[in-house]
From Swiss-Prot:
It catalyses: 7-phospho-2-dehydro-3-deoxy-D-arabino-heptonate = 3-dehydroquinate + phosphate. The gene is aroB. Pathway: Metabolic intermediate biosynthesis; chorismate biosynthesis; chorismate from D-erythrose 4-phosphate and phosphoenolpyruvate: step 2/7. It comes from the Bacteria. This is 3-dehydroquinate synthase. It comes from Geobacillus sp. (strain WCH70).
Length: 375
């Protein structure tokens, strides 16, 4: 079991990483001073309930009062209705300020359960137990939120967990599309801050099937280390932490416009990163070898163009709702070079022209468009 220290200006906490480490959870809780008899509320989703929940409850039942709340699987669960239902469950189970919430699942569960913890009785402890590759990003750094019909993650808080317990054995049950979705965030971390890691990914992860064993654990560790280094510098996203939104300006707009769940978060972010590289080459008058990136992304099955059915003007309006925007002006995270990110404001006219060009030029290269994969 590896241990990584996550450090911010307000808190320091451990991240435990390894195969089969969930069996050590009772010991970890004792190490974190959660005494016998503490009330635990496990928030998870339908998929994890069927696969692992009974095992997790049995693991903890000897030492703790264990309660559960199960949400629907999928992005739609990051809603006010589910948030309110979780709060109701916490009240009915009699949780107090010494109780603990366990966020057992992927990014949706982590975001929702973390926001429940941040606001229940003005804040109680929680621990992230991620079960997806995507959650290597969302489980670290304390950003918790639910969605609003007008925008993704618009209602939330910065609230750090007590710990992260990342057992990569859970990733074996992931379908290919979810593994691909999480890998997009791994690529993101390399592109914004670690050129050497980017080169390693190109050499070692030739296909999604390579994401297993030591390679998988290394990917997770490197991604977490990049995320931790950024969060250490900027916990509340006032500066460089916004670089972690590389690919998310268009990505979130696509998710919102298509309807949450129609396109996986990772597919949307991958397409957003490709567009950001496309824009970077034109804004900075440089070559990042865009065509090579497009081919590379395609080998993993990522979409490489904006679905032709989507209206570009509507997409722009969604992008203007991004949290990085200022006074109605879109601010995108671009690359000056691999490993060197920067936030750049872009006017509507420039963005519309680039969106249209990107949609037109890449449309013929993406087989998903021809069969209306998302629309």
């Amino acid at each position: 079991m590896e241990q990584i220290v996550i450090e911010t200006k307000t808190k320091q906490y451990p991240l435990f990483l390894g195969e089969g480490i969930i069996e050590s959870l009772p010991d970890i809780l004792r190490q974190l001073s959660f005494s016998k008899g503490t009330k635990l509320l496990i928030i998870t989703d339908k998929t994890l309930e069927q696969l692992y929940l009974s095992r997790l409850c049995a693991l903890l039942a000897n030492d703790y009062d264990v309660y559960t709340y199960v949400i629907p699987s999928g992005e739609e669960a990051k809603s006010f209705e589910q948030y309110y239902a979780c709060q109701t469950a916490a009240l009915q189970y009699g949780l107090d300020r010494k109780s603990l919430i366990l966020a057992f699942g992927g990014g949706v569960v982590g975001d929702l359960a973390g926001f429940v913890a941040a606001t229940y009785m003005r804040g109680i402890p929680y621990i992230q137990i991620p079960t997806t590759l995507l959650a290597h990003d969302s489980a670290v750094g304390g950003k918790v939120a639910i969605n609003h019909p007008l925008g993704k993650n618009m209602i939330g808080a910065f609230y750090q967990p007590e710990a992260v317990v990342y057992d990569i054995a859970f990733l074996r049950s992931l379908p290919e599309k979810e593994l691909r979705s999480g890998f997009a965030e791994v690529i993101k971390h390399a592109l914004i801050r670690d050129r050497d890691f980017y080169q390693w990914l190109r050499q070692e992860i030739r296909e999604l099937a390579d994401l297993k064993g030591e390679r998988l654990q290394y990917c997770i560790k490197k991604g977490i280390e990049v995320k931790a280094s950024v969060v250490r510098e900027d916990e509340k996203e006032t500066g460089v932490r916004a670089h972690l939104n590389f690919g998310h300006t268009l990505g979130h707009a696509l998710e919102n416009e298509l309807g949450y769940g129609a396109m996986t978060h990772g597919d949307a972010v991958a397409l957003g990163m490709l567009f950001a590289i496309f824009v970077s080459e034109r804004v900075y008058n440089i070559s990042l070898d865009y065509d090579r990136f497009s081919s590379w992304f395609r080998t993993y099955g990522f979409p490489v163009s904006i679905p032709k059915q989507l209206n570009i003007n509507r997409l722009l309006e969604k992008m203007k709702g991004d949290k990085k925007a200022r006074a109605g002006t879109v601010r995108m995270v671009l690359l000056k070079d691999i490993g060197m990110a920067e936030i750049k404001p872009l006017d509507d006219e420039t963005l519309l022209a680039l969106l249209r060009k990107f949609q037109r030029e890449e449309g013929e290269n993406d087989p998903r468009n021809s069969r209306c994969h998302y629309c």
